[in-house]
Amino acid sequence: MLKEIGKNAVKAAEQLKTVNTETKNQILDHMASELVKDVDEIIDANKIDLENAKQLELTAALTDRLTLNKERIQGMSDGLKKIIPLDDPVGQVTQSWKSEDGLDISKIRSPFGVIGIIYEARPNVTSDVSGLCLKSGNASILRGSSYCLDSNLMLSLIHISEPTRPL
């Protein structure tokens, strides 16, 4: 299963490196809008995680980090929207010079390809890193805590949903 996830991520990375800035920004806007639109479904999934946290007797601090409510989901949406005006790093020339032989040399930013991210019981990170990886042209493999499995699954489903308008 992990091998398949990795192969799919590499395929996605190949496609992502060719996506233009306008399309990335449209996708980010779509992701942000879907969070707000699907707030009730996200909260329902989060309730399952919170019930499990109660049964596992997790600390109040950890349970608070797991909790998603309308305000926090709006904050996640706002966070994605804040990525939109950021410069797209892909293709930026950071340095250029001419060698002694007359060869033009440039340092150009390019995507890594696939970024793996392991994070704790913070379902909001799912949206944050998805958006940042998209903007930087990278595919991502996310591994969130099992404490917020249902929340992360719902957020992932929302983020991979097809836009309702053409990009």
Regions found by a protein language model. Give the residues of each.
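Conserved small-residue-rich beta-alpha loop and adjacent elements
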Residues: 85, 89-157
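Short, cationic motifs built from Arg/Lys/His that form the positively charged side of catalytic pockets
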Residues: 24, 143, 163-164
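N-terminal Rossmann-like NAD(P)+-binding subdomain of aldehyde/semialdehyde dehydrogenases
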Residues: 1-104
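Single conserved hydrophobic/aromatic residue that forms the stacking wall/gate
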Residues: 158-167
